[in-house]
């Protein structure tokens, strides 16, 4: 009986949650340290980094705007805490859902974002998985938009670090939301779940916390000092304090190893994003190639933004593209589009984060 009582006194998070970490030089992508980094573990609310990445992508592609009014479903409203407290039938601007998901880590807001973009959470999860594959997150699979524990909803310290780097380089106009310690989320003023780390670690600028009983205490931490920029990801911390201390130690290690000067090598933005099929290049078409092209065309007609059915182009180069405006690089490009001008960046950041 005494042994049983002793077990009951041990925090559940301390009994579970395998540990993993990963540290990179953000400028080059160079790995500075790793431990258990490719083990598939529960990401918890680190998941919302992918939800937000897709939200930024959808805004850029013209699928939705920051001012779009989102009607909250019963499903989204039913999500457990952390939450914004949204009610079924309530309408709220997408910008407030983004703030709530990024800063407060609100599960109802994250679910509502997914439903607003893809119509349902399962459809959004499929898009999350397509995007993960395109980003090179080869050991991540997503089931929901918020990170609540679910069978098959897993990622790695390596993959979440890749995602953090892409958020920084692919969407610089929105990245500063991750450094905010509070924000107006429309129906409430929300405080950051990462505010302690942001306040305590010099140069910290994000990115996202995560916690569930199965995951333990997770964090993708980013900091910039001088010319250096390091991301350190921690999975399976024993507490908020333990997680933050580990992240600080890893960042210190990273800053110590990273050279003062390094040529920036931005990650290539994915050629295949969202509901858009991969571009197909066929030099000498065969029956097998033609069948593949037709299969891709058929897949497009089942997507939420389907092109007109029956329009299959069978040339030397068969390209199927989304009808929306794009700022993606051309096929073969190694660099993303240029960042907006400084004054435009500031205005866009104010739109979402202030």
Predicted regions mapped to residue ranges:
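Active-site-adjacent loops and short helices of periplasmic peptidoglycan-processing enzymes
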Residues: 11-157, 168
């Amino acid at each position: 009986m005494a042994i049983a009582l002793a077990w009951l006194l041990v925090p559940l998070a301390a009994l579970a949650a395998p540990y993993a970490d990963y540290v990179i030089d953000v400028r080059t992508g160079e790995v500075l340290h790793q431990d258990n980094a490719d083990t598939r573990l529960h990401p918890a609310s680190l998941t919302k980094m992918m939800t937000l990445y897709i939200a930024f992508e959808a805004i850029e592609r013209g699928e939705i705007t920051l001012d779009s009014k989102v009607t909250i479903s019963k499903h989204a409203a039913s999500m457990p805490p952390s939450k914004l407290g949204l009610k079924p039938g309530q309408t709220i601007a997408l910008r407030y859902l983004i703030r709530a998901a990024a800063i407060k880590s609100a599960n109802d807001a994250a679910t509502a974002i997914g439903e607003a973009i893809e119509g349902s959470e399962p459809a959004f999860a499929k898009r999350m998985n397509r995007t993960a594959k395109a980003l090179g997150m080869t050991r991540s699979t997503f089931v929901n938009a918020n990170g609540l524990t679910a069978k098959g909803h897993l990622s790695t310290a390596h993959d979440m670090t890749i995602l953090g780097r892409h958020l920084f380089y692919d969407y610089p106009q929105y990245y500063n939301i991750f450094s905010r310690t509070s924000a107006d989320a429309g129906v409430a003023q929300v405080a950051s779940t990462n505010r302690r780390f942001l306040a305590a670690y010099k140069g910290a600028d994000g990115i996202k916390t995560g916690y569930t009983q199965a995951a333990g205490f997770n964090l993708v931490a980013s900091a910039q000092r001088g010319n250096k920029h390091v991301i350190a990801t921690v999975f399976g911390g024993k507490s908020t304090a333990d997680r933050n201390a580990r992240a600080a130690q890893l960042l210190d290690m990273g800053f110590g190893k990273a050279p003062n000067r390094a040529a920036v090598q931005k990650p290539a933005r994915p050629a295949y994003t969202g509901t858009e099929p991969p571009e197909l290049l066929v030099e000498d078409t065969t029956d097998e190639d033609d069948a593949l092209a037709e299969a891709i065309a058929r897949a497009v007609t089942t997507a939420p933004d389907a092109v007109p059915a029956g329009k299959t182009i069978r040339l030397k180069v068969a390209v199927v593209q989304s009808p929306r405006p794009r700022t993606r690089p051309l096929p073969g490009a190694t660099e993303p589009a240029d960042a907006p001008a400084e004054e435009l960046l500031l205005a866009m950041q104010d739109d979402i984060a202030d």
